[in-house]
Regions:
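Acidic (Asp/Glu) carboxylate-rich active-site/surface patches
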Residues: 1-37, 41-145
């Protein structure tokens, strides 16, 4: 049985005519001193059921987050991590620095055909050349995010 997060991604793939859903989210926008960090993640369809218990990380216990992290990094899940430094945040502003971190995180996925990036938040990531769809509260709606 699939989770609501899996169903959301499946419906987005159908609606957007995508073969590949990549989730992108950031962390670190709250601290006064950077960096802001973003992650882009692609879970192959054959592995989606292995992560049926994934939910918004803010709703998980520390122990569950650690367990999921270990499962993700040891599985065939493709991911990229991007950073924007405190200096880049000061120079660009936090929103533009977040988009920079997202672009850096998604770099390895740029050549995937028929891919769509689901971006957590109300705005598309400026400068990201992947087709993208912003999803408000995406980390609570999408498995990929």
């Amino acid at each position: 049985m699939s989770s609501p997060l899996q169903e959301f991604d499946k419906q987005q793939a159908i609606r957007l005519e995508a073969n590949c859903i990549i989730g992108i989210d950031e962390a670190g926008r709250g601290p006064l001193a950077g960096p802001v960090v973003a992650c882009a993640c692609f879970i192959p369809p054959a592995m989606v059921s292995d992560f049926a218990d994934v939910n918004d990380s803010k709703k998980l216990t520390e122990k569950k987050r650690e367990e999921l992290y270990n499962r993700l990094v040891h599985a065939e899940v493709a991911y990229g991590i991007g950073f924007a430094s405190a200096q880049e945040i000061d120079r660009l502003n936090i929103l533009q620095a977040t988009f920079l971190a997202m672009r850096r995180a998604a770099y390895k996925f740029l050549n995937l055909p028929h891919a769509v990036a689901l971006i957590d938040g109300p705005y598309p990531a400026a400068g990201l050349t992947l087709r993208q769809e912003p999803v408000i509260d995406g980390d609570a709606k999408s498995l990929a995010i």
